[in-house]
A protein has these predicted regions:
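Short beta-edge/loop segments at beta->alpha junctions of small alpha/beta modules
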Residues: 1-81, 176-196
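Hydrophobic/aromatic-lined pockets within catalytic cores
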Residues: 23, 43, 96, 156-159
């Protein structure tokens, strides 16, 4: 059974998977004993998702690998129609734009669907609309924000995108690789206020072409801010209608 899981590259296995490998019923005593023994020996590690385990293959030894996507994969395996995406700093690290992983990853979910205790245990969960996390490409079987979506993440949820005041923030590297047309297409789904913030952030990180492409999507002048509403205004873009209370790229 262990060899089969390794051959097929399984990193998340369910109770049903183990039962199938053993050729027993899911409610059998033999199955329960086998899972208990596999956990004891370090081959399986229980996940927060009910009935799911992380498989720890022999090539790495029976020790946890620290895969940040394993809980998200387990939730999707159990609920294939569940809409989620890894966003912000965690996505930036996984996509290779930042060198440091966050202490805790953030996951956006469609607010219209039921919640997930497993996700809330493993991640910072942001509830949003389905269209804001649609079409995010998969990375290792989990949707993870790519370059254009990372800019939208920063505009929508600045707190999960690191310190945007840093002039050498990873967004600068993201913007250098970004397709302006792709960013503009995503801005159409983000809403007027977020679109204005996307354009402003791109401009602050010296990407005028991306900023202009996004700004063209605006049909009305926005009235929005970046940062806490009670904080003083650091900068203001009258054309976009953005008050910067955070100080994007000022340090």
């Amino acid at each position: 059974m262990i060899a089969d899981f390794e051959v097929f590259g399984r990193d998340v296995v369910s109770v049903a998977d183990v039962a199938t490998a053993l050729g027993v019923a899911t409610d059998s005593r033999r199955l329960k004993n086998a899972i208990h023994e596999l956990v004891k020996l370090g081959w399986l590690s229980p996940l927060s998702t009910r009935g799911a385990y992380e498989f720890l293959p022999a090539r790495g030894g029976p020790h946890p690998r620290g895969d940040p996507l394993v809980e998200a994969r387990a939730v999707r395996a159990r609920r294939p129609d569940f809409s989620l995406a890894v966003i912000g700093s965690g996505a930036s690290f996984l996509r290779g734009f930042s060198e440091r992983a966050p202490s805790r990853y953030a996951v956006a979910v469609d607010k219209r669907q039921g919640g997930s205790v497993a996700l809330m245990v493993a991640y910072d969960v942001v509830k949003t609309t389905a269209k804001r996390i649609s079409d995010i490409p998969d990375l290792h079987d989990v949707p993870v924000s790519d370059a254009a979506h990372l800019l939208a993440d920063a505009a929508l949820w600045p707190r999960i995108s690191g310190d945007l005041r840093d002039a050498d923030h990873w967004l600068r590297r993201v913007l250098q690789t970004m397709d302006p047309a792709a960013a503009a297409a995503i801005a159409l789904r983000a809403g007027t206020a977020a679109t204005a913030r996307m354009a402003y952030i791109a401009a602050r990180f010296d990407s005028p072409i991306v900023a202009a492409a996004i700004a063209e999507m605006l049909t009305d002048r926005a009235r929005t801010c970046i940062g806490a509403a009670g904080d003083p205004i650091v900068a203001r873009d009258q054309a976009l209608g953005v008050d910067d209370r955070l100080g994007i790229a000022t340090r």
